[in-house]
Design a protein with these regions (language model features):
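Hydrophobic/aromatic-rich core segments of domains that either
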Residues: 138, 153, 185-273
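Secondary-structure boundary elements
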Residues: 97-181, 189, 261-263, 278, ...
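Structural beta-strand/beta-sheet cores of well-ordered domains, especially the beta-sheet scaffolds
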Residues: 2, 8, 21-23, 40, ...
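Intrinsically disordered, low-complexity N-terminal segments that are enriched in acidic
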Residues: 1-105
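Glycine-rich, small/acidic residue-mixed loop/short-helix segments
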Residues: 25-35, 42-43, 246-280, 289-292
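A general structural signal for short secondary-structure boundary/capping elements
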Residues: 55-58, 71-73, 124-127, 273-292
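Glycine-rich, flexible loop/turn motifs
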Residues: 14, 88, 99, 157, ...
Length: 292
């Protein structure tokens, strides 16, 4: 079984000394049947005075670092080794009642899924509704897995990948209008489109790898950095992973770190500092994914 090694380094530089506030890091994957952690490491420079671990509302592992004193830099290096046991698309088994659109979740599931089923972004002219419903009509029989595969492929084929360093995400209608976006934007577009069909979805933050291309200087779109994709809840199959940036289904090339109801809740690093208004100089991010 392949062992994956991930190293994620984030560096902040400041022109003048600043005082660091609390920083929250979503960097440690959860052990599960599909991802077994072997070891993990978190190195912080300057060292934090207090480092504690908590589970957020979604069950993600969050490191909370506190600091004293001033500094002109902050380096956060997270690394882990893990074995990956991804689901293959052909292994997905959906309950009979959910094999075709339309269907409804059971009463208990509907309550527990809560706001993950609800639309979060404005669609006053029902443009996204029409876009999603058209996919259902185009798929013979309206099979659930087939519609979601078509949606994943449509985003990959019709929209142009355009990485953005800016924080946040584009609204789904903006991504459709521009015809381009980052992996975060594509993930959010698919989340909201699936919610148009009554499905529960979650935003996933993690890493992308292609074992065949590691070390070859090329890879899937979005590799070499943090990556974003989607989980859709399907009765019988559970939370199924879809990457619309690369038209991937089932998680073979996806290393999940955290999940959230909305992209704003899944930042790998968030924090603050106190200092002069022009103190911030630069930020750099480096991600290495290798196998052993």
């Amino acid at each position: 079984m392949t062992v994956l090694r991930v190293r994620h380094t984030t560096r902040y530089d400041y022109r003048k000394p600043v005082e660091l506030g609390e920083h929250r890091l979503m960097c440690r994957p959860r052990d599960s049947h599909d991802l077994r952690l072997i070891d993990t490491s978190l190195v912080i420079d300057p060292p934090s005075t207090v480092l504690r671990w908590v589970h957020d509302v979604f069950g993600n592992s969050i490191a909370v670092a506190s600091f004293n004193g001033s500094t002109d830099h902050l380096v956060l290096e997270s690394s882990f080794r893990a074995q990956h046991f991804p689901a293959e698309p052909g292994e997905l088994v959906v309950e009979a009642f959910a094999e075709r659109f339309p269907f409804s979740y059971s009463a208990d599931d509907a309550v527990d899924l809560g706001r993950t089923k609800e639309r979060h972004y404005a669609d006053p002219e029902h443009e996204l509704d029409r876009w999603a419903q058209a996919l259902v009509q185009e798929v013979p029989g309206g099979g659930t897995l087939e519609v979601l595969a078509a949606m994943t492929g449509r985003i990959k084929s019709q929209l142009k990948y355009a990485p953005r360093d800016a924080e946040g995400v584009q609204a789904p209608l903006e991504t459709l209008a521009l015809g381009s976006g980052s992996c975060r934007d594509f993930a959010l577009l698919m989340m909201e489109a699936a919610r148009c069909l009554g499905l529960a979805t979650r935003f996933v933050s993690g890493y992308l790898y292609d074992e065949r291309l590691i070390g070859a200087g090329a890879g899937l779109v979005g590799g070499g950095a943090t990556h974003a994709w989607v989980q859709v809840y399907l009765p019988g199959a559970g939370w199924v992973e879809y990457d619309p940036t690369n038209a991937l289904i089932g998680g073979r090339n996806l290393i999940r770190v955290g999940v959230a109801r909305d992209p704003s809740q899944a930042a790998p690093v968030s924090g603050r500092f106190t200092g002069p208004g022009d103190a911030f100089a630069a930020m750099s991010v480096s991600v290495e994914v290798t196998t052993e």
